[in-house]
Amino acid sequence: MFFYLSKKISIPNNVKLQCVSWNKEQGFIACGGEDGLLKVLKLETQTDDAKLRGLAAPSNLSMNQTLEGHSGSVQVVTWNEQYQKLTTSDENGLIIVWMLYKGSWIEEMINNRNKSVVRSMSWNADGQKICIVYEDGAVIVGSVDGNRIWGKDLKGIQLSHVTWSADSKVLLFGMANGEIHIYDNQGNFMIKMKLSCLVNVTGAISIAGIHWYHGTEGYVEPDCPCLAVCFDNGRCQIMRHENDQNPVLIDTGMYVVGIQWNHMGSVLAVAGFQKAAMQDKDVNIVQFYTPFGEHLGTLKVPGKEISALSWEGGGLKIALAVDSFIYFANIRPNYKWGYCSNTVVYAYTRPDRPEYCVVFWDTKNNEKYVKYVKGLISITTCGDFCILATKADENHPQEENEMETFGATFVLVLCNSIGTPLDPKYIDIVPLFVAMTKTHVIAASKEAFYTWQYRVAKKLTALEINQITRSRKEGRERIYHVDDTPSGSMDGVLDYSKTIQGTRDPICAITASDKILIVGRESGTIQRYSLPNVGLIQKYSLNCRAYQLSLNCNSSRLAIIDISGVLTFFDLDARVTDSTGQQVVGELLKLERRDVWDMKWAKDNPDLFAMMEKTRMYVFRNLDPEEPIQTSGYICNFEDLEIKSVLLDEILKDPEHPNKDYLINFEIRSLRDSRALIEKVGIKDASQFIEDNPHPRLWRLLAEAALQKLDLYTAEQAFVRCKDYQGIKFVKRLGKLLSESMKQAEVVGYFGRFEEAERTYLEMDRRDLAIGLRLKLGDWFRVLQLLKTGSGDADDSLLEQANNAIGDYFADRQKWLNAVQYYVQGRNQERLAECYYMLEDYEGLENLAISLPENHKLLPEIAQMFVRVGMCEQAVTAFLKCSQPKAAVDTCVHLNQWNKAVELAKNHSMKEIGSLLARYASHLLEKNKTLDAIELYRKANYFFDAAKLMFKIADEEAKKGSKPLRVKKLYVLSALLIEQYHEQMKNAQRGKVKGKSSEATSALAGLLEEEVLSTTDRFTDNAWRGAEAYHFFILAQRQLYEGCVDTALKTALHLKDYEDIIPPVEIYSLLALCACASRAFGTCSKAFIKLKSLETLSSEQKQQYEDLALEIFTKHTSKDNRKPELDSLMEGGEGKLPTCVATGSPITEYQFWMCSVCKHGVLAQEISHYSFCPLCHSPVG
């Protein structure tokens, strides 16, 4: 981090300043001083030039207002940024609140206790409350609108400072005796703060400043120290919270007057003065520290006595009140950033996330890739890759092959230019300094350095990828202590015990090239090692402590920026004679520059470098500077006589939206001069100038200029000089062209002015060349346009190619509907199928399948698409069209379309379907899914098996005593399946019998075959018995309830034939009941006799029946009134009349209705009341 003074504003009449405060949001600067002086200033930059943004832009005072109202010396000024208010107080205790009205500051409120002087005022984080403390111990908390919230007198205490916590729950009060007391936000005392920094301090001390950073811009890392307390004797402590028992301790070694955090809590500035060595007067200085107490640097400030400091809102400037002046210093922060292959990598913190947000901004395509990285330490780049040095995440253990560094606390992550991690390395030393070359990564702590010869995947052979062996690992990773003298042989090993040994002369900077590694130490010693075998070659001695080291492209010179921003150069190979007459290697060059904060060597010239000095960029050639360029950018890259610079300050104001305007290219003087010569003087003179100052970039410039003028001889010579083989070939090709306009068009195309080139071709009536140009560029939209606009016939194959390429363009962007239009025209069936599928346009997909010829290679793919969405029929059609019946059957099975599966299997003589069906059915039965198995058999047209299972269910339900209606339905369903089975057998036989035999004969043969198959099964002979039994059982009860007792008796009498289906006890109980109601006591008596003889009844039940019979037959004789009619019903056997299923009566007429499904009859006069058959419920035809 570097800082330098940039501006000075003097206060009229030499009035001494006491305080200064910079409004972070609006940029106003308030300063107060003696004799009631109070001024509000505003510095504004006016520039439209993109290069002059940020610190480099000239700034002027846009506001300089003196506020009248104080008479005594103004001692405290504080801003309320949320509500744009300024609160000031003077030595008489007068407090004034100012507000901005129509561009100037006016008094809003005044308050004067007249008792004591205000020592400190503090607004809370949201600007709602202010706390004011007086010297006599009075505390007042007020609201932003001027109302008093509470007040308190702390007896016997002299107050000097106050500050709020970030959440406004805690107040810290600093006392005149140096103590700090912690109170809650209602003014209740909680505890005294432990001041570890004052251990062993004697004498009177006072608090110089308390500043609590509120986390508005996020924290450098989670749980980062943010509360700074500093005393006038230079002792300071930085705490994580008010009760932190283990704070960061600093001894600044100076008399302190004030402290302040920057806008993001990453830098603490401490202002004060020091006794200068060998002088009586004090020296004003500002020291800068990190939250962890690391010293970042010292800024010396002229003048007698510094009294206050304040940061600007962006953290790039700091205002210092010294005597009757305000000095401004510019800050050049240590951003975590890098540049690799057109990508700017930068990191920033966000208040809503604990990690660093690392952005990989591809400046060529203006795309950005964001990664969140925990515990980021630094970013280092080289070529196409970058290294992120981070703290290891405790929650994630390392991989198995990292066992030898287990417990490693840091990680070096190798990433490509879009942030993809390629290779992490866990190490056990703090990577304070990281350097990177095309082959090596070097990380150094203060005592040791680690080298890793990295390889990236594209360079690895398959063999190496397979053998990540320990030996190879050790060959690639080494560790060396800075005090060791390695010889360059294989003596470096991965031994972390070396890092534990300390050193008296720690490392302070490193740099490396492909050939050498340079390590700088705090004493000024520079150690030079060879690479890739690390051997100590040379030690040099400098009289400064290096902060940043940099090697030129041939590793002959070293640039050193020290901690105070002085740039010097060292020639590593020069041999000189020292004062004692001995010859030594290495020489400090004469050039020295001050206030330097960045430098970069040219990649292609060892004598060229660019450096940043204050807000100017200088380019040096052989240590001679060119005229400076005004800018504050960080240098990304210097090659081809062009410098690429990035305005990181501007980018980090809005890091989520980097703007290409913040990337600036500067051309160095020789390039500018050559360009001017070519334009004004001509090619001949320019070529002489370039001959005297040769550089490939200048020769290329000359070649391009010669091409523009079609001076092919000069162009070819220049291309040869810059070794541009493509350019030479292009010139040769141009030489063979006859037409001047054709040459001109080619040249225009070469320079990327494609519209102009196309226009020229079309004017020459060479549409083919225009199309060829667009083809090379891949601009298919324009190709299509040109093909369609031409007068002659367009090339069909090219048209198709163009349509397909445009279809691909839309498909890549998932605009399927647009893609379809072009694929149709390009007849690209493969991509069409994909688009229809993505659009869920299955009709279009089906039509496409229909339009394809048989056995087309796309059909199986389309069929699979239908399978994936469950469209069985379309899938089967597609499979059959490409002669894949097995796949069609598998699809039907997969989608549970078993009937279709069986049909296909039969049609294509496939034997395995039966076994597959049986396997699936048994699987269902095992899981007790009998109904699913029945459905499976039914769909597969295996009606007989389905019926068997159905009868089984019906029998089980009957045994359970379920509702009779349900049982009847189950028996009807079973019988219907049997009927379907009969029908199937007949049809199968009809199909088999060919020739002259009649239909009746074939049907009969089918039945005979079926007879042979089913002799064993009783239900195939009389499938309807179960249904009949429960039908009559329900019908008899219904007739009984309706009061038709005679018909009920007739129906109940039928049940005697069904004792094997309905339990006899239920049959004869119902019969007895109906007979008794019908007064047919003879029949009733027979029913009771039957009941008594049943073996299934218990003796108690039999006794109950006996008692009931006794009761009935003591009153009535056991005779039937209508004997003959009942007798005819009681007779069974062959001569039995058919029964009407609607009434239960026998059918005596010759004509009656018969159901076509169950073959049961209904009396002719009854059927007119029914729409469906009373037994099987099939429609009455």
From Swiss-Prot:
The keyword Cytoplasm applies. Signal peptide: none annotated. Pfam families: Beta-prop_WDR35_2nd, Beta-prop_WDR35_TULP_N, TPR_IFT80_172, TPR_WDR35, Zf_2nd_IFT121. SUPFAM superfamilies: DPP6 N-terminal domain-like, WD40 repeat-like. Keywords: Cell projection, Ciliopathy, Cilium, Cilium biogenesis/degradation, Cytoplasm, Cytoskeleton, Disease variant, Ectodermal dysplasia, Repeat, WD repeat. It is found in: Cytoplasm, Cytoskeleton, Microtubule organizing center, Centrosome; Cytoplasm, Cytoskeleton, Cilium axoneme; Cytoplasm, Cytoskeleton, Cilium basal body. GO terms for cellular component: axoneme; centrosome; ciliary basal body; ciliary tip; cilium; intraciliary transport particle A. Component of the IFT complex A (IFT-A) complex. IFT-A complex is divided into a core subcomplex composed of IFT122:IFT140:WDR19 which is associated with TULP3 and a peripheral subcomplex composed of IFT43:WDR35:TTC21B. Interacts directy with IFT122, ITF43 and TTC21B. Interacts with IFT43. Interacts with CFAP61. It is linked to Cranioectodermal dysplasia 2: A disorder characterized by craniofacial, skeletal and ectodermal abnormalities. Clinical features include short stature, dolichocephaly, craniosynostosis, narrow thorax with pectus excavatum, short limbs, brachydactyly, joint laxity, narrow palpebral fissures, telecanthus with hypertelorism, low-set simple ears, everted lower lip, and short neck. Teeth abnormalities include widely spaced, hypoplastic and fused teeth. As a component of the IFT complex A (IFT-A), a complex required for retrograde ciliary transport and entry into cilia of G protein-coupled receptors (GPCRs), it is involved in ciliogenesis and ciliary protein trafficking. May promote CASP3 activation and TNF-stimulated apoptosis. This is WD repeat-containing protein 35. It comes from Homo sapiens (Human). The gene is WDR35.
